[in-house]
């Protein structure tokens, strides 16, 4: 009897995308085990640099003995191809941002998100099992009508973070300034406006020799990005740098330049950049929301319900009090050691016991 294929179906496949990185890690594991494995995605949503690394959805044709894994974060053509497949099906749930965050900024996207949340239970019912990348996501999936998801946390790979930093970017940004860093899409659920307001207080009242680097695509929600730019102008706060999308080498540079990593996100399924920042030894301050606490694993600094002045004072203490900073960084390094020692392949084999030949 021939081995089953282990293929993955994605709505899109992009540089710097956490779901895409997860798919690559799983594909590499499956191939290492000796299984044929490909990533299939909608060509309209594939980065030009990755077109040779995946196949179009129209090429997918899984048979009854094959296994199809679908990374679900938005209703898409990939979901349709997945549910119509004859293969045995596994849903991997990456969370769907609640649509209310986008209403007023992008009503069309809000409608897409609402549809995705409404459809996920039906997609899950057509699968033999569902995995969630955090306990928070498993509970969210249950609330949407698909209980009993098994938790398979987002897999961390250090390889992209061990690249040589971008020399030109490092030279451009090297300066005697306390650097606050935030990495992620500029989207309403990230609550970047909260970070900007706290930074304004920090810069004007506590440390004028400071800057805020916002690294991430501004295409996720153009109206929200415009609002953020207007807020910076209204506050007349300097050194707020919208850096846009970062290359892998550029991202390493940003982490190495940072004194603090801050996430004000009000909704996170997990939060991969939190782990990346800890890997680089950057103290992390994050809102206690969604799967953030799971990503931090008891490390970093979690906050909730802070006013801008209070959050600014927290920035100051973590950045300037050496003993506190050393304790935070030590706890983060313990967390990273645990993350790197995680038996990922053992977990995968256990999850796939009923799908692979013994």
Regions found by a protein language model. Name each.
Residues 266:
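Aromatic "clamp/platform" in nucleotide-sugar-dependent glycosyltransferases that forms part
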Residues 124-166:
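Donor nucleotide-sugar binding/catalytic pocket of nucleotide-sugar-dependent glycosyltransferases
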Residues 41-45, 211-229:
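Glycosyltransferase donor-sugar binding loop
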Residues 301-308, 317-322:
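Conserved acidic donor-binding segment of nucleotide-sugar-dependent glycosyltransferases
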Residues 225-249:
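Nucleotide-activated donor-binding/catalytic signature segment of Leloir-type glycosyltransferases, i.e.
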Residues 131, 171-190, 196-199, 213:
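Conserved donor-binding/catalytic core segment of Leloir-type glycosyltransferases
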Residues 274, 283-286:
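Short hydrophobic beta-strand element within catalytic cores of glycosyltransferases
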Residues 253-258:
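Short alpha-helical donor nucleotide-sugar binding micro-motif in glycosyltransferases
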């Amino acid at each position: 009897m021939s081995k089953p294929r282990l293929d993955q179906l994605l709505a899109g496949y992009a540089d710097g995308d956490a779901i895409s990185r997860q798919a690559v890690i799983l594909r590499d594991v499956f191939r290492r085990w000796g299984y044929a494995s490909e990533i299939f995605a909608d060509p309209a949503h594939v980065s030009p640099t990755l077109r040779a690394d995946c196949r179009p959805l129209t090429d997918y044709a899984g048979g009854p003995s094959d296994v199809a894994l679908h990374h679900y974060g938005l209703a898409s053509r990939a979901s349709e191809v997945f549910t119509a497949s004859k293969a045995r099906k596994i849903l991997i749930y990456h969370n769907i941002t609640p649509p209310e965050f986008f209403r007023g900024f992008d009503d069309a996207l809000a409608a897409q998100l609402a549809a995705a949340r409404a459809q996920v239970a039906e997609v899950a019912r057509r699968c033999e099992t569902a995995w969630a990348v955090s306990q928070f996501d498993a509970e969210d999936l249950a609330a949407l009508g698909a209980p009993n998801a098994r938790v398979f946390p987002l897999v961390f790979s250090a390889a992209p973070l061990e690249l040589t930093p971008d020399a030109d970017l490092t030279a451009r940004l090297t300066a005697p300034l306390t650097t606050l860093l935030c990495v992620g899409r500029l989207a309403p659920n990230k609550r970047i406006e909260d970070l900007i307001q706290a930074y304004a207080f920090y810069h004007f009242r506590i440390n004028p020799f400071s800057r805020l680097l916002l690294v991430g695509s501004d295409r996720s929600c153009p109206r929200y990005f415009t609002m953020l730019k207007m807020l910076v102008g209204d506050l007349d706060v300097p050194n707020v740098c919208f850096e846009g999308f970062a290359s892998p080498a550029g991202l390493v540079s940003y982490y190495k330049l940072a004194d603090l990593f801050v996430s004000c996100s009000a909704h996170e399924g997990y939060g991969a950049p939190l782990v990346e920042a800890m890997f680089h030894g950057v103290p992390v301050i994050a809102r206690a929301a969604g799967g953030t606490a799971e990503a931090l694993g008891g490390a970093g600094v979690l906050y909730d319900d802070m006013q801008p002045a209070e959050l600014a004072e927290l920035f100051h203490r973590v950045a300037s009090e050496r003993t506190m900073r050393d304790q935070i960084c030590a706890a983060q390094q313990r967390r990273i050691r645990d993350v790197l020692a995680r038996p990922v392949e053992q977990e995968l084999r256990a999850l796939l016991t009923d799908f692979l030949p013994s």
